[in-house]
Design a protein with these regions (language model features):
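Glycine-rich phosphate-binding loops of nucleotide-dependent enzymes
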Residues: 1-189
């Protein structure tokens, strides 16, 4: 994900990163972001000293479908907390804010690194529901997730990484769901 977002160069063994057909492998991260790639990093990384609303507004693009109202519609709890500093939010609220902040950039591609990490079951269910809503709305999401149930529930396509970052398996989630032996071999379940 960090390579796709322009935060790390592609491996020396070759390869490239393309966004809408354009090779962005050598571009700095801010130029990759301008081309519509947004990252929700592992660990959330919100601006703790800024309010919820300031966190959202600081990255907002003036044009596009995502604005404060739409983010607040997706995550109503953020409306209640809009004047609170980011550091005062629970882990789940911080994750909602991190996702909302990325959406405010109106991304073509939303990268999400371990969005379920450290979340309570009720919050995890909410995030799962919202990822499903984003999927239905046509938002492209690339998810790196160790929670297999979550990944299989929201994905259109699954890639399981093997040795040295190679793709060990790729296909529709139903194929893995219907083949527990294959799933166990690939991910050790």
């Amino acid at each position: 994900l960090r390579t796709i977002a322009g935060l790390r160069p592609p491996r020396l063994t070759g390869g490239s990163v393309r966004v809408a057909g354009e090779d962005v492998s050598a571009l700095p991260s801010y130029q990759v972001a301008r081309r519509g790639v947004s990252l929700v990093p592992q660990g959330r990384r919100i601006f703790g000293s800024l309010s919820v609303e300031e966190n959202l507004q600081i990255v907002a693009r003036p044009t596009g479908a995502w604005d404060l109202g739409r983010v607040y519609e997706l995550f109503p709890r953020l409306v209640e907390r809009r004047r609170q500093a980011g550091w005062t939010l629970s882990g789940g609220e911080q994750q909602m804010l991190a996702i909302g902040r990325s959406l405010m950039t109106n991304p073509r591609l939303l990268l999400m690194d371990e969005p379920s990490e450290g979340l309570a079951p009720a919050v995890l269910d909410l995030i799962l529901d919202r990822l499903g809503q984003l999927r239905l709305q046509g938002q492209a999401v690339l998810l790196a997730e160790q929670n297999v149930d979550l990944a299989l529930a929201v994905a259109d396509r699954v890639c399981v990484l093997g040795e040295a970052g190679t793709i060990a398996w790729s296909g529709p989630p139903a194929t893995l769901r219907d083949a527990p032996a294959v799933l166990a071999e690939l991910v050790g379940l």
